[in-house]
From Swiss-Prot:
Belongs to the BshC family. The lineage of its organism: Bacteria, Pseudomonadati, Chlorobiota, Chlorobiia, Chlorobiales. GO terms for molecular function: ligase activity. It comes from the Bacteria. This is Putative cysteine ligase BshC. It comes from Chloroherpeton thalassium (strain ATCC 35110 / GB-78). Its EC number is 6.-.-.-. Pfam families: CC_BshC, Rossmann-like_BshC. Keywords: Coiled coil, Ligase. InterPro entries: Bacillithiol_biosynth_BshC (IPR011199), CC_BshC (IPR055399), Rossmann-like_BshC (IPR055398). Residues 472-517 form a coiled coil.
Length: 561
């Protein structure tokens, strides 16, 4: 499978696509060295750091038997494949380590970068096992389902023709402040899914397969989280992917030590984040994660409520007026840890307390978050994982490839890589460059030269004929004028054709922009994976995996299909 790579900093079409922190993190420059040394525990580029992390994590004690039981139970519910259960069992050994990634539980797995994150984790486990054959590395996908931002997950974006369509659903039964992933699928949702989204899939050789895949995952009465996990398990059935939900009591029990320490020591973890964030901002970067005095939520009547400290050792649940003493909250943490939910600041700490995490595969925004978390890892006495950038891709459908092949010919280039690079940098400037190169003939100049030449020929011819018969000169004049009029007509037709040719080219580039940068945003952040699976089958996942096994993840990859 062929691919072309573009440095992240070169992608500026549609505005700045990446934060400065992410650009520095992936640029392999002195800025990268300075950033990583100050704000991260490990350098993802350095094999010595991976070796050290392997030794550190394998030497720690985890609740492995209990973890294996919980992961087995969950993945049986999700319908995971046999290889997944082999890998879960391998976690009983200290020599089995996790490469973790995760995402919110969006409809139909959300934007296609969810697929790329998952593939990135799988690819790293295979690469690292080759280099460290005495250790097993297992890919783990963390379901981020407890967030109560329903709007964040309740939509699907597809291309209909060349127009971006965003399909959103508002669940009438959704209770404000409840976990979005726990929302139950209703008959109304299934009706919307069938009529709005599945009907939007263009006819293809794989449409029926895709419809079956979705319908077998999204069923009445199951939660959004369960539907997401079931679909993800089917897509990666043969890859040994372990999927984990942090919501069940069995998992929360493994994490209760974090809840207890947070409640006993608040606002210490927030102060750690604030101090680290201040250093980050002094270095010219933005601090994105906002800590709270207590970085936990509390479930009450299915609502995920903030825990706010009050005077005299009490806490209040917000919104609302329920109060508990600090002692009562600690009792809950010991006896009913499922009532607690970490916020963005504490979630990684929970994750890496329970899982033997050697690395976390992160998107650009997550990499920025982790830059604020180093002190908190130290505070909770947990090794911070290697923060590895996920693979970033744009898929080039055949019709789009042909546009760039045509562009390359106009620009006299052997490959499309140059055209792609200039397109992602500034599409309008790229169009102007194409028009200049395409207009190889100056019609006005050529027509003027032809008219002048023909006029000279006819005048000489008229002079010769007038020597024989002076009246013939008038006939020559008429023929000349008719001929010159024909040249003028040809000039007008040529100019019109040239303009039309340019208009077609411009239209093709703009259609390409709708596909590669829908809404001015990178394709991977907008389009759902089923836009591609419906056209190219889910075997596309295996093809992309084979490609990524040969690539680093330090540039944006353009992949012709």
């Amino acid at each position: 499978m062929q691919s072309y790579s573009i440095p992240f900093h070169s992608i500026s079409e549609g505005g700045k696509q990446f934060s400065q922190l992410f650009l520095d993190y992936t640029s392999n420059t002195l800025a990268t060295d300075a950033l990583i040394s100050q704000f991260y525990q490990h350098d993802y580029r350095n094999p010595a750091h991976l070796s050290a992390q392997i030794q550190t994590v394998s030497g720690r004690t985890y609740q492995r038997p209990e973890l294996v039981l919980e992961l087995t139970r969950q993945n049986q519910l999700f319908g995971s494949g046999p290889k997944t259960f082999e890998r879960i069992q391998s976690l009983l050994s200290k020599k089995t380590l996790a490469v973790v990634t995760g995402q919110q539980v969006g409809f139909l797995t959300g934007p296609v970068y969810t697929i790329y994150k998952t593939l990135s984790a799988i690819v790293l486990t295979e690469k690292w096992h080759e280099h460290y054959p005495d250790f097993e590395f297992v890919p783990v996908f963390w379901l981020e389902s407890e967030d109560h931002d329903y709007e964040e997950i309740s939509h699907v974006s597809l291309l209909k023709g060349n127009s971006l369509e965003r399909f959103s659903y508002s669940e009438a039964s959704y209770q404000a402040l409840s976990s979005a992933g726990a929302t139950q699928i209703t008959p109304e949702f299934l009706d919307w899914l069938g009529k709005e989204i599945l009907e939007a899939f263009p006819e293809s050789d794989y449409k029926q397969k895709m419809l079956t895949l979705v319908r077998e995952s999204y069923k009445e009465g199951v939660s959004y989280e369960m539907a997401f996990a079931t679909l993800l398990a089917r897509l990666f059935y043969d890859e040994g992917l372990i999927i984990v939900s942090s919501h069940p009591k069995g998992f929360k029990t493994l994490a209760k030590s974090v809840f207890i320490r947070e409640l006993e020591t608040f606002p210490a973890s927030s102060q750690n984040i604030i101090a680290q964030s201040a250093r980050l901002e002094e270095s010219g970067y933005d601090a994105q994660a906002k800590p709270r005095p207590i970085n936990l939520y509390f479930f009450q009547e299915n609502q995920r409520l903030k825990i706010e400290p009050r005077r005299q050792g009490s806490v209040e649940l917000l919104p609302g007026k329920t109060t508990f003493s600090q002692h009562e909250m600690l009792e809950f943490a010991h006896s009913a840890p499922e009532l607690f939910s970490p916020n963005v600041v504490l979630r990684p700490i929970v994750q890496d307390t329970v899982l033997p995490t050697v690395a976390y595969v992160a998107g650009p925004g997550e990499i920025s978050y982790f830059g604020q978390f180093l002190r908190n890892y130290q505070f909770f006495n947990i090794p911070m994982p290697i923060i590895y950038p996920r693979a970033s891709l744009s898929l080039l459908e055949p019709k789009i490839s042909r546009v760039f092949e045509k562009s390359a010919r106009i620009l006299n280039e052997k490959e499309i890589s140059g055209s792609l690079s200039r397109f992602y940098q500034n599409s309008q400037q790229f169009i102007n460059e194409l028009l200049l190169a395409a207009s190889t003939v100056d019609i006005e100049d050529e027509a003027t030269t032809a008219i002048q030449g023909l006029s000279d020929i006819f005048k000489k011819f008229g002079l010769k004929l007038s020597e024989i018969d002076p009246t013939l000169a008038q006939s020559v004049e008429k023929v000349m004028q008719s001929t010159l009029n024909q040249v003028e007509n040809l000039k007008s037709k040529t100019i019109k054709a040239e303009k039309q040719r340019h208009n077609d080219l411009i239209a093709q580039i703009e259609k390409s922009r709708d596909n590669l940068l829908p809404g001015g945003v990178l394709q991977e952040r907008v389009l759902n994976g089923f836009h591609f699976f419906n056209k190219f089958d889910t075997t596309l996942i295996k093809l992309l995996k084979e490609l990524l096994l040969t690539k680093a993840f330090d540039k944006h990859l353009i992949v012709p299909l």
